[in-house]
């Protein structure tokens, strides 16, 4: 980010963090949402994903039926911090992890998982303990 700031004189509006996802910023909430949608659309276009993002519950049910190993994998090998913090309590988190894994494996790419020691450290962080208490 520092190199970008030095070269361009401002912070980037979009930042990708491995195992975290995309961070998008804008002056107003509507602009931020629109930019986030644009980023997601470009990613889907690049990956030739034509189907709309699935409803969480329906996608989880389909994965349980057709790819049960994904559910097992979800529980023990997280892709991103929200998966560690919220686990199965938030269907959107489960669906996102399964969706990402499905599309990565369909292309023959390797998954980059959060190592067990880092996942364990995450749940001990004060900020994450606070997020664990969130009600959905």
What are these regions (language model features)?
Residues 1-136:
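Glycine-rich flexible loops
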């Amino acid at each position: 980010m520092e190199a970008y700031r030095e070269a361009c004189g401002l912070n980037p509006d979009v930042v990708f963090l491995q195992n975290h996802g995309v961070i998008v910023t804008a002056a107003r909430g509507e602009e931020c949402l629109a930019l986030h949608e644009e980023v997601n659309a470009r990613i889907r276009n690049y990956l030739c994903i034509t189907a709309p993002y699935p409803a969480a519950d329906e996608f989880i049910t389909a994965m349980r039926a057709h790819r049960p190993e994904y559910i097992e994998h979800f529980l023990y090998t997280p892709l991103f911090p929200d998966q560690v913090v919220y686990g199965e309590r938030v269907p959107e988190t489960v669906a996102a992890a399964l969706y990402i894994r499905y599309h990565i494996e369909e292309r023959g790419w390797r998954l980059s998982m959060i190592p067990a020691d880092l996942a364990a450290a995450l749940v001990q962080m004060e900020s994450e303990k606070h997020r664990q208490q969130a009600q959905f």
